[in-house]
A protein has these predicted regions:
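Unchanged
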Residues: 1-245
């Protein structure tokens, strides 16, 4: 119906076999799909919008999915806008800020920002955050920066005292809040894909027992001060799976 650009490839990927594989498992499923269809991650600019969940807080949209919840705005064509429409509009400018790679977003967090503020990494990962009062930050994920200006720690729903003692609060009482949006370079995507580049590997990592978390299993280890010992103490979304060690 001429509502989406014909030059862009769109795909809706359910969790394999109808089983919940977690946001991390779903991301690995995306990587497999892209590699099968494009052959590599070079020259690919990919937007991933995770939209799973039970819609417990908004059950009236469980049938269509939270991503297609209406928002109080009418589009130029006269149709009522949805979260998906707003994502397409707000994220359309990000592609020009990256050579190749993937932007992963959470489908229930609408972000409005100027894409010109983004410098996508040539190699590695970068998270999109914004400054907010520490009182608000204690209810969200917060990034604590190291001496090089990179993310040193990912602190999730910590007290004001903990955030302050860990050096996550600036002189104005602000913290860097995690928005759920993360940029991955093409070479990092290729590295992640090696985890699932055979059917046997895919079966180990993408299943309803491990239920890998995009944030706990992917983002946490990327912080410069993360340790393996602390990572093992993080609570998994699914079962604690010995075979993944």
């Amino acid at each position: 119906h001429n509502m989406l650009p014909a030059s862009t490839h769109y795909a809706v990927l359910p969790d394999p076999d109808g089983k919940r594989v977690g946001s991390g498992g779903a991301t690995l499923n995306v990587l497999r799909y892209v590699h099968e269809n494009a052959g590599s991650f070079e020259n690919q600019r990919i937007l991933v919008i995770h939209s799973g969940g039970d819609s417990k807080r908004v059950p009236q949209y469980s049938a269509c999915g939270k991503l297609f919840s209406p928002v109080p705005r009418v589009l130029p064509n006269g149709k009522r806008s949805t979260l998906f429409d707003e994502f397409m509009i707000s994220m359309s400018g990000v592609a020009a800020r990256m050579n190749a790679g993937m932007l992963v977003c959470s489908g229930d967090v609408l972000l409005l920002f100027n894409p010109l503020q983004i410098d996508a990494p040539a190699s590695g990962a970068a998270a999109i955050s914004f400054k907010e009062d520490v009182e608000t930050g204690k209810n969200h994920g917060v990034f604590q920066m190291d001496e090089q200006g990179n993310v040193g720690e990912f602190l999730h729903k910590q007290t004001v005292e903990t955030l302050t003692s860990r050096g996550a609060v600036n002189a104005q009482g602000k913290v860097d809040i995690d928005t759920g949006a993360v940029l991955f370079s093409a070479d990092l995507l290729a590295d992640l894909y090696t985890l699932v580049d055979t059917p046997a590997k895919f079966a180990v990592f993408v299943n309803d027992r491990a239920r890998l978390s995009f944030y706990g299993d992917f983002l946490y280890p990327l912080a410069s001060r993360s340790t393996l010992e602390q990572f093992y103490r993080e609570k998994p979304d699914g079962s604690f799976t010995e075979e993944l060690h």
